[in-house]
């Protein structure tokens, strides 16, 4: 009976798996056997931090700054709801990887026809390039703010981080996780310090986490709210998470998978809570520094930087802000490289050397950034940053819907299939995100 069940599960996939996801690091991080809970949890911690990076990349900063400066603390509830949706979707992605041994790209390639799989690959690559554009722009702006390096040269300098990525990959997957966690802590500490300097209204903050009807009734507020929701869940993160959870040496048995799912959920939920604190602190800082002082139209990251020192009365406020921005851009670079490799190998079964893969993605991101910077300067760069987030929003449903489909399929997931209530919630979220992105696309096109 057990053998028959295994055979049925195997038959749910059309083709045998060619190679494990990220084969060079798959099953490479040891998990101590018979260890106590917290020691095991520590061994499983790490992938969640890499995922959380996508929730605090430079692309998210613009929406949080705009929301805080224009509407005060009201949109904090939107950041909270976005985070809850993220926890749900990332838990599905990690479960898919742990149970099936396939990442989302491999599963999609097997399930769908070759032409449709190719379309999904193109869309996923566009999302990764869009993410990389946001990283390039964020790092270039930070270098400009900290050292006065012209934006166009800052964009070119970001190509050098390729060598950092390659060095860390060579050292081992745990090194990448440690660097990412260090940079995340840097960002959190920076914004913690900024918040202390800004003296926010704690009562207004508490009220901001309660959803208000005006978010829906005020068109301008609704648009920024949708922008926060649309830019929070990153499509490449779903591919990434379904792969990197497999770096752990958990037993590939039912009990081992169940334990891995539990620890992975704790890991990602903890890391996404840190991301929530960072995003909330960006909005709180913008509200305390700009909204309460009547500066309601802070157009971009550079404007926020310039206004922080005189508003907060501290000479280091802007510097700390720029350091956090640079850390955010570098963090996202590390995860973008891995996601690109996962997508190309999973959909096309093409295995490029990491240096070639990274150069290809970075060149495709740098070229538009250099052209826009040369032609339009800082204003053009901010427009490109917003455009990259629109591209990400458009692609999201093409990752979310297959993810919900696969994790709701008993033949693929066996006893780990989504429960009836989880299916209802997951499909509701998928439909909501699809509607949200259609609305955002329509609004963007009509406002051109």
From Swiss-Prot:
The chain crosses the membrane at residues 41-61, 69-89, 117-137, 147-167, 176-196, 215-235, 270-290, 307-327, 363-383, 384-404, 424-444. Keywords: Cell membrane, Ion transport, Membrane, Symport, Transmembrane, Transmembrane helix, Transport. GO terms for molecular function: cadmium ion transmembrane transporter activity; manganese ion transmembrane transporter activity; metal ion binding; symporter activity. H(+)-stimulated, divalent metal cation uptake system. It is found in: Cell membrane. HAMAP family: NRAMP. It comes from the Bacteria. GO terms for biological process: iron ion transmembrane transport. The gene is mntH. NCBIfam families: nramp, Nramp_1, PRK00701.1. Belongs to the NRAMP family. It is a multi-pass membrane protein. This is Divalent metal cation transporter MntH. The keyword Chloroplast does not apply. PANTHER family: NATURAL RESISTANCE-ASSOCIATED MACROPHAGE PROTEIN 2, SOLUTE CARRIER PROTEIN FAMILY 11 MEMBER. One of its GO terms (cellular component) is plasma membrane. Pfam families: Nramp (PF01566).
């Amino acid at each position: 009976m057990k053998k028959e069940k295994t055979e049925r599960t195997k038959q749910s996939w059309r083709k045998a798996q060619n190679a494990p996801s990220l084969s060079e690091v798959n099953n490479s991080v040891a998990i101590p056997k018979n260890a106590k809970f917290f020691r095991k949890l520590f061994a499983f911690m790490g992938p969640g931090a890499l995922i959380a990076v996508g929730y605090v990349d430079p692309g998210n900063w613009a929406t949080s700054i705009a929301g805080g400066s224009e509407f005060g603390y009201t949109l904090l509830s939107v950041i909270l709801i976005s985070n809850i949706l993220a926890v749900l979707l990332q838990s599905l992605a990690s479960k898919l990887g742990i149970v099936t041994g396939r990442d989302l790209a491999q599963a999609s390639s097997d399930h769908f026809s070759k032409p449709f799989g190719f379309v999904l690959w193109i869309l996923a690559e566009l999302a990764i390039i869009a993410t990389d554009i946001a990283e390039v722009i964020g790092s270039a702006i930070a270098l400009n703010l900290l050292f006065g390096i012209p934006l166009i040269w800052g964009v070119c300098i970001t190509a050098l981080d390729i060598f950092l990525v390659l060095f860390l990959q060579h050292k081992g997957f745990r090194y990448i996780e440690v660097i990412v966690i260090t940079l995340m802590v840097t960002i959190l500490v920076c914004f913690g310090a900024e918040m202390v300097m800004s003296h926010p209204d704690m009562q207004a903050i508490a009220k901001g986490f309660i959803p208000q009807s005006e978010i829906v009734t005020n068109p301008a507020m609704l648009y920024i709210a949708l922008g926060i929701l649309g830019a929070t869940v990153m499509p490449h993160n779903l591919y990434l998470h379904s792969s990197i959870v497999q770096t752990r040496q958990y037993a590939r048995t039912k009990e081992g998978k169940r334990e891995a799912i539990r620890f992975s959920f704790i890991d990602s939920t903890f890391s996404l809570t840190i991301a929530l604190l960072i995003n909330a602190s960006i909005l709180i800082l913008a509200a305390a520094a700009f909204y309460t002082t009547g500066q309601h139209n802070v157009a971009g990251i550079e404007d926020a930087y310039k206004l922080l020192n005189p508003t907060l009365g501290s000479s280091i406020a802007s510097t700390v802000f720029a350091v956090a921005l640079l850390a955010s851009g570098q963090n996202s670079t590390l995860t973008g490289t891995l996601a690109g490799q996962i997508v190309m190998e999973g959909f096309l079964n093409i295995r490029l050397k990491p240096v070639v893969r990274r150069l290809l993605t970075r060149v495709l991101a740098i070229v538009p950034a250099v052209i826009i910077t040369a032609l339009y300067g800082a204003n053009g760069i901010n427009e490109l940053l917003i455009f990259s987030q629109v591209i990400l929003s458009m692609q999201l449903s093409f990752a979310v819907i297959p993810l919900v489909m696969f994790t709701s399929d008993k033949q693929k997931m066996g006893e780990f299939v989504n429960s009836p209530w989880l299916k209802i919630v997951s499909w509701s979220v998928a439909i909501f995100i699809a509607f949200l992105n259609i609305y955002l696309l329509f609004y963007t096109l009509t406002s051109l």
